[in-house]
Curated annotation (Swiss-Prot):
Lineage: Eukaryota, Metazoa, Chordata, Craniata, Vertebrata
Protein's name in the database: Alpha-crystallin A chain
GO cellular component term of the entry, any: nucleus
Domain sHSP: 52-162
Major localization listed first in the record, in broad terms: cytoplasm
Amino acid sequence: MDIAIQHPWFKRALGPFYPSRLFDQFFGEGLFEYDLLPFLSSTISPYYRQSLFRTVLDSGISEVRSDRDKFVIYLDVKHFSPEDLTVKVLEDSVEIHGKHSERQDDHGYISREFHRRYRLPSNVDQSALSCSLSADGMLTFSGPKVPSGVDTSHSERAIPVSREEKPSSAPSS
């Protein structure tokens, strides 16, 4: 078995380039000691190995894509059901709110809540917006784009979240 040896000076020199989970959206998941004291963990031992970091898309960070034909938002909401999610269009933005009451998990009781707001491009057809939640917890909000001269604005309205039985086909960056 090969064990990589990491010298403490190497990690400290590259400390600003190592990702930290402290400000990521790990809903209900615990922090590791290197999230709070990243430089201290490398001075403990040169043989110390960190846990594996998640990829950017697995970390709950949303992805916004604005192509020529459509506008799409992908958001990882795996801890929420469609009943826990509210999606509203307010003039030129979309608000996604998720909240579930306290429930028991492996480590005790937990309640979660988040609120996200995204600006919609001016040429998105707000009457054709859709929102779906895949089986693996990926929320997909999408709307087609129209030519520039068409009026696309509408008043405030809620977008229903439909449930898909298959995992998300969200492209990874």
